Regions:
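Short, low-complexity N-terminal intrinsically disordered segments enriched in polar/charged residues
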Residues: 1-28
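Localized chelating/binding microdomains
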Residues: 18, 43-45
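Short, well-ordered alpha-helical segments enriched in acidic and aromatic residues
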Residues: 27-41
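Surface-exposed, charged secondary-structure patches
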Residues: 52-103, 112-116
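Boundary/linker segments of alpha-helical solenoid repeat arrays
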Residues: 46-50
Length: 116
């Protein structure tokens, strides 16, 4: 099944625990756990040294709030992008979270994730 064929509710149910884990392991600075649900292409593309530097030096990346607000879902090709409102526990304001999901070897994997 193509993930784009799922309902919004089904996609959000798949996305929520994946985003929750990204927030948790980002806050803890645990790159190995942070990347455990990445697609093979995303895992190859992200340099562990750069990611480790980001965890060590980004106040935002180490202080993400657990509460999120899903803002929408975009379907394209074989992937969906879930957009979230993300907050920090230390910095005032709101950020845009982006989580790109698709199937790889029959499992839902993360093909992209970022906070703007």
């Amino acid at each position: 099944m193509n993930i784009t064929e799922k309902t919004d509710e089904e996609i959000l149910a798949l996305a929520r625990p994946l985003w929750r884990d990204l927030v948790k392991y980002s806050n803890e600075g645990k790159y190995g756990e942070f990347a455990r649900n990445f697609s093979s292409s995303l895992a190859r593309a992200i340099d562990q040294v750069v990611a480790g530097h980001q965890f060590a030096n980004s106040e935002l990346a180490r202080n993400l709030a657990e509460e999120i607000d899903p803002l929408g879902i975009i379907r394209r090709g074989e992937h969906v992008t879930v957009v979230y409102r993300q907050r920090s526990t230390k910095k005032p304001g709101e950020w845009l979270g982006r989580l790109v999901l698709g199937y790889e070897d029959g499992k839902v994997r993360i093909f992209g994730a970022s906070i703007f």
